[in-house]
Each structure stands twice: as C-alpha cells, then as structure tokens.
C-alpha cells in the first residue's frame, strides 16, 4: 500500500440509506449566486432562495460531504434533502432554530 492510497471496494457507495428524503423546487430570486454546502441546515439558507421552507426544517442537501450546490440568479432547480441525524439539535447558521428540532 502507498501512503495516502485509497482501497475502495467495487460497486456503488450508497449515502444516507434508510433516511427520509424530500424533493423541493428551489429558485434564486436574488441578483447574486448563492452556494449552499452539503451540511448546511437548508431551512436557514439565504432568504433570496424561494422554496417550501417549512418542508426543509431539519434537513440538509442529500449530496456527498464537502460538496455544494450553486444557485445562479433567476435559476430554478429540483433538489433532494435528507433528514439531519445525530442529536437533531441545530445551533448557529442563521440562528432560526438554536436548539432541538
């Protein structure tokens, strides 16, 4: 083995197996691009993003860790969200929850 080398088993790696997901239509009504990271509480994203915010409470983007989705001005797209796991307590971000979900 070479230091730092990955030895990945063949086949697909499934993310977030068995967790609740929801698909939402999201539009950027602003005049600047908005980028949302993989573990950002989607409910608390920039107010220029228009979508069913209540349906996104306690959820994040269902994408690989360390990646992000970019919404260009005027762009609309379908995104998939997945339930946050762990203790289901949210602090920080935009400060809209600050505690248990």
Swiss-Prot record:
EC top class named in words: hydrolase
Compartments, as annotated in UniProt: Cytoplasm
Enzymatic reactions: urea + 2 H2O + H(+) = hydrogencarbonate + 2 NH4(+)
Highest taxon of the lineage: Bacteria
Catalytic activity, EC: 3.5.1.5
Keywords: Cytoplasm, Hydrolase
Pathway the protein acts in: Nitrogen metabolism; urea degradation; CO(2) and NH(3) from urea (urease route): step 1/1
Database matches in SUPFAM superfamilies: Urease, beta-subunit
InterPro entries attached to this UniProt entry: Urease_beta-like, Urease_betasu_sf, Urease_subunit
GO MF: urease activity
Any Gene Ontology CC annotation: urease complex
Cross-referenced CDD domains: Urease_beta (cd00407)
Keyword Hydrolase: yes
GO biological process: urea catabolic process
Transmembrane segments: none
PANTHER family named in the record: UREASE (PTHR33569:SF1)
Subunit structure, interactors included: Heterotrimer of UreA (gamma), UreB (beta) and UreC (alpha) subunits. Three heterotrimers associate to form the active enzyme.
Family, as annotated: Belongs to the urease beta subunit family.
Listed name of the protein: Urease subunit beta
Originating species: Pseudomonas fluorescens (strain SBW25)
Gene encoding the protein: ureB
